[in-house]
Amino acid sequence: MASAETEARLRLLPKVELHQHVDGSIPAEVTWELMRHYRLHPVETLAEMRTRLELQPEEEGTLLAYLDKMHYPLWITQFYENVAKVTEAIVDAAAAVGVQTLELRYSPIIHTFAGLTPRQSIRAVLSGMNHASRRHAGMRLGLIVIAMRQHGPHIAKILARQAISEAQHLHARVGVVGFDIAGPEKGNPPRLFKSAYEIARLGHLGLTVHAGEDAPVDYVWEAVDRLGAQRIGHGCAAVGDPELLRRLARDEIVVECCLSSNYHTGAIKRGTPHPIQRFLEAGVPVAICCDNTTVSRTDSVRESARAAEEIGLEAVEAAHRAAEAHTFIHPETALRESDGE
């Protein structure tokens, strides 16, 4: 548990969030409000709704239980206005705890069941981010589009093209800044998505890959060698391969460390140190990230405090300063107020 002094210092620290999912970060009260608006009543109270959205202690340890918490938000994020609304709420919550640079990530394909196209789904998130940016002057915002592994390489290529169409460097507003694959790793190795990543690279999007969270170190190697990853999401498996650590350090490939989430999903076993310290000792750059603020009952201050218990407060402050150099957000448009959606 962080001291009050440490928490206050971290709250004032300009923080950089490079790995946060929209679906798992919608404030519970916003989901509850929209559920009631649509007369959806899976539970009777907000307190009960929280237990459905937030991972409970007895549920920790498996990725399946963790991902199941995304089920209820999907009920209400199939409509443009709702997606924009929840995105605004997420940005507001991040700003409230001192996040200065925020990259949200989002899988548009799973928000198309009520008729939105993937492009409209992407635009809905960007609309929410642009509206929120007007309230938070100086906050840097960008969106990473996710292709889900289980949907296959062809859909990933389609989404890469859709992402490029809304790329930040093509618009004078908050836009898409990166491309990612997520979802079940086992049976879906990164090499299958090489063509999609080549499209994203040619479109000047930043490249990050969920790898080594629930799969062996080979998947991290593939993300680096075959997909050209500039950042690795989670990357827990990499810590056991000295050669890979040297490669990550040499090429300054950032590991997006999500401490609470890694323990919650079982990627790191309870009672064992998080690999963030080993990454730093090997010279691998790290970013301290929330993953899913609602599911993991966390925020950037809490994650930073948790990391401070592993690596020390000064190292946490240094990590946030260094992470700014690895954001995919383009500086020439990052702070410009939007005139449109």
Language-model features: where?
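Metal-cofactor-binding active-site regions of metalloenzymes
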Residues: 1-205, 213-222, 226-231, 237-254, ...
